[in-house]
Amino acid sequence: MRILPRSVEKLIESFSRLPGIGPKTAGRLTFYLLHVPQTELDNFSDAIKNLKLQTVYCSKCFNIGETDPCVICSSLDRDEDLVCVVEQPIDILSIEKTGKYKGVYHVLHGRIDPLNNIGPDEIRISELIKRVKTGHIREIILATNPNMEGEATAMYINRELKTLSSEAGSRSAGNQGPIVTRIAHGLPVGGDIEYADEVTLTKAMEGRREY
């Protein structure tokens, strides 16, 4: 015998598929929405429906936006020779809140995670390498999260960039590749950039070291 209406069950199942939301939380969210006015529910529904319909990926940095290129890549006030590599678009929001970073970004949309079958080919590392090959990038800042997967991703990218520089020629030959740096102190091991405050992120960016 079905106790809950099918529409309620379906919404609970949908919420449960979201990361970090278990069945109990999904149930609480669903029953909360039952008490929300229909106009608010309609606005919520429209926001979800338009989430992908009205957003695009920037062809330069793979951030999300309403236009391609995105507002950051299109800005004349940005230093295009300085590229900060992040795991997700939400990390850009955290770094931008510091007001200190004036370069551009490259969004990987993930991190190397062998336990979940996510390798280098599943995230946008090859696009970063291509960007380095075709551009005039002075510095690459590796701002992946300071956890096991983030460190593995940073190490892999660093190795690929060093190999690329070696193939292009030695520094003395005038074919110097970009400096590769890693965000430094301030971020705890195992922490996520998304949850770091502005002061901590500013210290991490200013204290970055060559990788």
Q: Locations of the language-model features?
A:
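Switch/connector loops and helix/strand junctions flanking conserved nucleotide-binding motifs
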Residues: 92-95, 114-116, 149-152, 190-193
